[in-house]
Regions:
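Family-specific signature for flavin-dependent thymidylate synthase
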Residues: 1-207
Length: 207
């Protein structure tokens, strides 16, 4: 699994909104650094941490912190990710429309945990897929050949999606998946931990 082009947005507006109930905007002490990163001041960070720990009714502001990221992952992982439908959007590369557009190679598939015997068999599957693809391209794009590719395609095939989500969704994912048996979820949780103020606003680890 690979994470690229991560962007965290709207932190300033989310923190300002968190102060609306108490009209305490005068206590805001955050600012942008020279690189354009929004740095929370002590007052704002203290408020954000207290609201985060007070429960979902009090931490509405975390739903207003948005994240965009390009994730490349195998189809078997996307099947699990797709259970998170609330406050997530994803635009994916099209398997149906573009599967034939370039040669198949073993690196199109997640195979890092395969035994040597299974990897050798996987090479024959990839070879068969490429033979079907060439037949499809050279013999008039017959639907039978297209179906052969689609139905033979292993769930380890890697797909890239541009995903958007918010910090509340990431709280739910982090605590539901951090002990999952799939290594991809452990990588996902480490990516979450790398986000700005993830320790305080998502993981909310005790000091």
């Amino acid at each position: 699994i690979k994470f690229e082009r991560t962007s965290v947005m709207n932190l300033e507006n989310a923190i300002r909104g968190a102060r609306n109930p108490m009209n305490s905007w005068g206590r805001m002490d955050s600012a942008y650094d020279e690189d354009g990163n929004y740095i929370l001041g002590p007052n704002d960070l203290d408020l954000a941490k207290r609201l985060r720990r007070a429960g979902s009714d009090h931490r509405k502001y975390v739903r207003q912190i948005f994240v965009s990221v390009d994730i490349t992952a195998p189809l078997y992982w996307w099947k699990e990710y797709d259970t998170y439908k609330v406050a997530t959007v994803a635009n994916s590369t099209s398997t149906m429309h573009k599967i034939h557009s370039r040669p198949f190679s073993i690196d199109d598939f997640s195979h890092d945990h395969m035994t040597p015997e299974t990897l050798a068999f996987m090479e024959t599957v990839v070879g068969r897929l490429e033979a079907i693809r060439l037949k499809y391209m050279e013999e008039g794009k017959n639907k039978e050949d297209w179906y052969d590719m689609i139905q033979l395609l292993p769930s380890s095939y890697n797909q890239m999606r541009t995903c958007t989500m918010n910090y509340e969704t990431l709280i739910n994912i982090y605590y539901a998946r951090k002990a999952h048996k799939l290594e991809e979820w452990h990588s996902f949780c480490r990516w979450i931990e790398s986000l700005p103020y993830a320790k305080e606003l998502i993981v909310a680890a005790e000091e």
